Swiss-Prot record:
Function: May function as negative regulator of plant defense.
Main location: nucleus
Organism: Arabidopsis thaliana
Miscellaneous remark of the record: Plants over-expressing VQ20 display enhanced disease symptoms after infection of either the necrotrophic fungal pathogen B.cinerea or the bacterial pathogen P.syringae.
Name by which UniProt lists this protein: VQ motif-containing protein 20
GO cellular component: nucleus
Keyword line: Nucleus, Plant defense
Residue positions of motif VQ: 91-100
Lineage, broadest ranks: Eukaryota, Viridiplantae, Streptophyta, Embryophyta, Tracheophyta
UniProt gene name: VQ20
Amino acid sequence: MSSTYKDNHPYHHHPHHHHHHPKREPNENNSGILYTPSPSPSPPTLKVNKDSHVIKKPPSPSSFSSAAKPRHPVIIYTHTPRIIHTNPKDFMALVQKLTGMTHSDEDLGGGNAMTDPGVVKSINRTVSEPTVDRKNNRNRCGGGNNYLRNYSGAGNGKGIFFNNTMISEDSESSSVITTEENIGEHGQVNSSLPYSAVAIPPQPPPHPPPPPPPPSMYDAAGINYGAYLPTFPIFPPANPADNFLCGNQPFANFDDPLFFAPNMRSSFSSSSSSGFDGLTEFRDF
């Protein structure tokens, strides 16, 4: 009887028999949910294609612009650049010189301003070309030696005296002012301008001085009043159109020592820019 109990007891473990659980259906569990049976207890490992590593995500435009470095311009020299050393104060003058001159002038070097053709041409044009408007305007400004004369045109070799000071009218762009201090021992005028810059053509000889005053100009005491009065010419002017405002009369008698010093009556050098033949009178022709 005991053997029958052992065979029928479900928890009895026989040394020659395995433990048997109640058989269950594969799609059934305790909750009643059905699952698809898995083919293997663990999922298979993923394999990466050998060409997958070359595929990269393209960067965004914002990150591309920030990461890109600025490209510098490429300078290609057709000629070897020349290095010129100069001072900062001379930089602008050097730039104007290099940009305003031709290549042939640059090869000549710096030079001075007088050797440049443009400068010499402008100087010659200023000195040699006369103006179209040639007018003589005379204005008496008070008495004494205040005598104003405005002249425009090429030089005529005459001068004006203001209190023993001579102003030469030789050109519209050049003038020489001389006083008794810069006149040499032999009556030569020491001019500060070069001779070529103020050279003037030779002038015709002046007219002879007016005749002396008649004896009636002397009073009983022997004083010559004619020396202090203007002497009018006895001949008519060469051009009647010039006889206006003040006429063709001299300003005063130049024999009076009040106007000239003794060394001013001496001969002037021909190398002077004034071109005077003499200072015996002051007259317009």
